[in-house]
């Protein structure tokens, strides 16, 4: 019967769509990258989504984040995302957590419930904890490397973390994961060298923070606020979602 996922079913088949419907995917970080991952997973028919992010929409998010508009500024990102998902697919189950994921909050999450985990968070300590927790639970995970200060969305590719180069975040992750005995990690990364942001104090978040009231981690607390745009983070988020969908459905080109 024709339905909103019929065009997707033409690629992944009825069995693939059933796998997506029965899948539970956790997305950690609902920002410029993770927001587009969530959007694509919802439109692909993933049945259950867990959204983890403690942040509120800031005016400076509107340039790149799909859930950020002038109307949603000040609202929790997970709440905005949940409402949008249910507009796309009213049958979806959405769990939201206003939590900043870190080694200290990791035990709040039971990874054995998940069929796939997406890492779209910014901190190295959080990323490492996510990977370790997924590894212990035997759950597939894919991780986003650096997307800030870059302008070429076509430069991103999927690789194992130990096959990456150029990206400073990937280098740190390689070193730390090796220490922890993690042998593999699927990532999305770019070989494009990061740009140096223009030093303009009139548009500096650190000098003129406009984070909404109630924001837990303001721009003034960050060591550096990277430059961003409307076309790189979305590309990374969509690549992440594509890998999740292909892995969950068992898709192989040519079959």
Question: What kind of feature is each model-predicted range?
Answer:
Residues 98-106:
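Conserved SAM/SAH-binding loop
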Residues 27-29, 52:
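Conserved N-terminal Rossmann-fold NAD(P)-binding element of oxidoreductases
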Residues 46, 51-89:
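Glycine-rich phosphate-binding loop and adjoining beta1-alpha1-beta2 segment
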Residues 33-34:
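Hydrophobic/small residue at the entry helix of a nucleotide-binding pocket
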Residues 1-26:
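N-terminal charged helix/coil linker that caps or initiates catalytic domains
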């Amino acid at each position: 019967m024709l339905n909103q996922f019929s065009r997707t079913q033409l690629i992944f088949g009825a069995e693939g769509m059933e796998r997506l419907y029965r899948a539970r995917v956790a997305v950690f970080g609902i920002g410029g990258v993770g927001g587009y991952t969530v959007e694509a997973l919802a439109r692909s028919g993933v049945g259950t989504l867990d959204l983890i992010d403690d942040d509120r929409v800031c005016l400076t998010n509107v340039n790149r984040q799909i859930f950020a508009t002038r109307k949603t500024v000040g609202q929790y990102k997970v709440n905005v995302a949940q409402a949008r998902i249910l507009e796309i697919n009213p049958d979806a189950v959405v769990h939201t957590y206003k939590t900043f994921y870190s080694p200290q909050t990791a035990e709040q999450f039971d990874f054995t419930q998940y069929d796939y985990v997406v890492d779209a968070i910014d901190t190295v300590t959080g990323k490492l904890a996510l990977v370790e927790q997924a590894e212990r639970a035997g759950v597939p995970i894919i991780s986003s490397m650096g997307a800030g200060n870059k302008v070429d969305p076509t430069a991103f590719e999927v690789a194992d973390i130990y096959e990456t180069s150029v990206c400073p975040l990937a280098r740190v992750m390689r070193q730390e994961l090796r220490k922890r005995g993690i042998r593999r990690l699927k990532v999305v990364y770019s070989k494009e060298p990061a740009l140096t942001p223009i030093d303009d104090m009139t548009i500096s978040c650190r000098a003129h923070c406009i984070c909404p009231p109630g924001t837990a981690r303001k721009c003034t607390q960050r060591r550096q606020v990277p430059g961003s745009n409307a076309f790189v983070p979305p590309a990374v988020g969509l690549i992440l979602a594509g890998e999740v969908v292909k892995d969950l459905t068992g898709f192989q080109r040519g079959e």
